[in-house]
Amino acid sequence: MGNELFLAFTTSHLPLAEQKLARYKLRIVKPPKLPLEKKPNPDKDGPDYEPNLWMWVNPNIVYPPGKLEVSGRRKREDLTSTLPSSQPPQKEEDASCSEAAGVESLSQSSSKRSPPRKRFAFSPSTWELTEEEEAEDQEDSSSMALPSPHKRAPLQSRRLRQASSQAGRLWSRPPLNYFHLIALALRNSSPCGLNVQQIYSFTRKHFPFFRTAPEGWKNTVRHNLCFRDSFEKVPVSMQGGASTRPRSCLWKLTEEGHRRFAEEARALASTRLESIQQCMSQPDVMPFLFDL
C-alpha cells in the first residue's frame, strides 16, 4: 500500500511497457516510514509533528478558513471602495472646463482617425457593373451634391429619429419574388421608366427588410431585369450633345409584364394579403400599389 501511494500519478492509462517500468520502480524504491515521527512545534501554534514531502500544504502555516485571509481581503475592498469617495469634489468651473476640453479632444481625434465613409457598402460577391450601370452610378453621384456640414446634421438627426421609431421591430422578408418587387416599382412610377437605383430606392422604401439585408439582393434584381421578357430597356438619348456619353438606361414593363403582374397580384391578394401587409412600412397603400 505504501508503494502504491508513492506514485505521483496512476499508470492504468499508460502502455504496457510503461506500466511494467512503474511497477519495477515501486519494487526498488523504498517508501517513507509510517507513521511520521512527531516533533515538538517551535511556534506552538499547531500539532506537534513535522509534515513530510507528500503533503501539499503545511498545516502549521495555513490559516483557518474564513478568519484571517477573508478579513484581509475585505479590508482591501473597503479601502478601494472608499478611495473614490474620499477625493475632494471639483469646482463647477473646473468640471465644465474639463468637460469642454474632453469633448474637443474627442472630436479632433475622431475626425483624424475615422476615414470618410462610403454611402453604399457592397459585398465581395458583387457582380461587375456593365458600362451602362457604371455610367448610371456616376450620374447619380454627380447629380447629388454632398450637403454642407451645417445641413448634414438635420438630415442625420431625421434619419436617427426614423430608425429609432422602428428600432424595436424586426422586419421579415416579404413573400414576394423579385419579379413582383421590380414590377411594383415600375408600374407605380412615371411612364418613362426607372433606372436601377430608383428600383432599389422604391423597394427599400416600402419593404424595410431590404434596408438592412445583405447587398446580394441588388444583384438578383439586375439578373431578373436582364433575363426576363417582362421588362424592356429604354435607352435615353444624349443630353443636348453636351456630354460625350449617353445617360443610363431606364427600365419599363412590357405588355407581357403588365398581364402577368395583374394575374399574380390577384392570386397574392387572396392568399398572402395579411403577410404582405405585415412586411410593408405603409400597409394602407397596398391596394393602390397592387391595383386591387
UniProtKB/Swiss-Prot annotation:
Amino acid composition bias (Basic and acidic residues), ranges on this chain: 35-47, 70-79
Biased composition (Basic residues): 149-161
Keyword tags: Activator, Cytoplasm, DNA-binding, Nucleus, Repressor, Transcription, Transcription regulation
Tissue occurrence: Expressed in testis (at protein level).
Chain intervals with Polar residues compositional bias: 80-89
Cell compartment(s), UniProt: Nucleus; Cytoplasm; Cytoplasm, Perinuclear region
UniProt xrefs under SUPFAM superfamilies: Winged helix' DNA-binding domain (SSF46785)
GO molecular function: DNA-binding transcription activator activity, RNA polymerase II-specific; DNA-binding transcription factor activity, RNA polymerase II-specific; DNA-binding transcription repressor activity, RNA polymerase II-specific; sequence-specific double-stranded DNA binding
Pfam families: Forkhead (PF00250)
Keyword Cytoplasm: yes
Region ranges (Disordered): 31-50, 65-166
Acidic residues bias spans: 129-140
DNA-binding region boundaries: 173-272
Disease: Defects in FOXR1 may be the cause of a severe neurological disorder characterized by postnatal microcephaly, progressive brain atrophy and global developmental delay.
Name listed for the protein in its UniProt record: Forkhead box protein R1
Species whose genome carries this gene: Homo sapiens (Human)
Lineage: Eukaryota, Metazoa, Chordata, Craniata, Vertebrata
Gene name per UniProt: FOXR1
